[in-house]
Amino acid sequence: LLPEINDRTDEYGGSIENRVRLTRELLEETKDAVGDTCAVAFRFAVDELKGSDGMQFFEEGRAVVEILAEIPDVNVSDWANDSQTSRFEPNEGYQIPYVEFVKSITTKPVVGVGRLTSPDLMVSLIERGALDLIGAARPSIADPYLPNKIKAGKTDQIKECIGCNICVSSDNFAVPIRCTQNPTMGEEWRRGWDPESIKPKKTDQKALVIGSGPAGLECTMQLARRGYHVTLAEADNKLGGRVLFESGLKGLSAWKRVSDNRIYEIQQKNNIEIYKESELTLSHINELGINNIFLATGSSWRKDGVGRSRRKPVQGLEALHVLTPEEAIKQSPNLSGPIVVYDDEQGYLAGVIADHLSFDEHEVIFITPASVVSPWTESTLEQKRIQKALLVSGVNVICNKTIDKAEGSNLNLKCVFTGEISLLKFSSLVMVTERIPNTKLYDQLVEQENTTEQGEAKHIQLIGDAESPGLIADAVFLGHLAAQSFEEPEQEIQKAMFMREMPSLK
């Protein structure tokens, strides 16, 4: 289809009609062969998002659709553009401007996608004639009951997709699919989970959930759905935990839906008691007299340099201005001089922190032992956009180097290949390396149960980042798993872990 690639001089090259000829013939012959037994779709990029260097929707992209008007499945460039994250494309329906012309040149029903989560927007697109059908892939992963809720007028109960592409990462890693909003996704057959229903309680036991981050909120909500009376205690004056922090970073505002959806449902329940600004101690828990305790106490970022690339602390950091990600954002208005963001977690957060600080007009230096910025985000289709965003904003990106040690106001950077040392002057250092679970209260509870009869608990469990630091999706899943597993036979829980669905073709 592209003139820069197709250099034929026969009837299959030259004009756009000739370049489309082979595609049209293949489609027509395929359709003749299969008849009405199945659909034949042609998916191509109506706009490669390369400007004049590629196909554009208002020029040859449209011409191809016009020639094949009754056949095509129009797409916006490759998957990374087709399934953009909310971080880089916050607007719902962002693909509509590229494809709304299709309905005017075909008699076929037209379906469109673009992370459409708002029922009002969906209806408006149909009413104004842009689309006939709404395609909702990621939104229906987040909430499989999306159409039913719209039909029933229960739009306030929709679990809206946050556009994080955790579902896409699962596909790229070839592992069972996961969703930040919907922890039951991928567990329908193996564990029998459903996002709208859950097995009832076994007894009249009460539960205490400590911490209202993603794991704590999910665990509280699901225990209450089962019928248990739940007490939720939060040390802060707001519910949400790490979601509050991360959704406040540049580009991640949609992530707040994770806490907002759960808080809304929790507030509708009459079997949940919520206590904010309540940092519980061992004595407080003993006074409450609740024997089933779920600790969603989160995790804390290390400041000593221990991460993926090194397992021993960096020498010389003790006397320097070293910050955690949370401290860096909180202190941003008062920071000055070069700020180093050191990423040895190699996930998504360090790139967001660097971008946020640069947006605050700081001089930022991004250092990582990896060969690219935020390598894990290749799985969410964001890596190139993240690296581009940092470079465009003026961040000095240094890859393939670790922090060997600190001397005065200098960092000794070590090349991961040659071992060569270089010096870098800085004012503040933000460490994004590794998190340590906050288990102090859990350890006290376990020790008390093992040594005394006072405050004996029938069930003490770490959940979320306090159990194993990970993604928000991981925390939500662990909170859900804890609620589903409560008072259930351990044998059944373990058995489900090893069940594998084996599809067969007939």
What are the residue ranges of the model-derived segments?
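Flavin-dependent oxidoreductase catalytic cores
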Residues: 1-210, 214, 219-225, 229-230, ...
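Local beta-strand N-terminus motif with an aromatic residue
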Residues: 69-72, 131, 272, 290-291, ...
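Anion (oxyanion) recognition and catalysis
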Residues: 104, 224, 267, 358, ...
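N-terminal glycine-rich dinucleotide-binding loop that anchors FAD/FMN and/or NAD(P) in oxidoreductases
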Residues: 158-163, 245-275, 307-320, 378-405
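Short, structured coil segments at secondary-structure junctions
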Residues: 106, 129-130, 270, 289, ...
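Generic beta-strand/beta-sheet core signal
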Residues: 3, 43-45, 74-79, 113, ...
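Short beta-alpha connecting loops at secondary-structure transitions
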Residues: 82-88, 109, 132-133, 244-251, ...
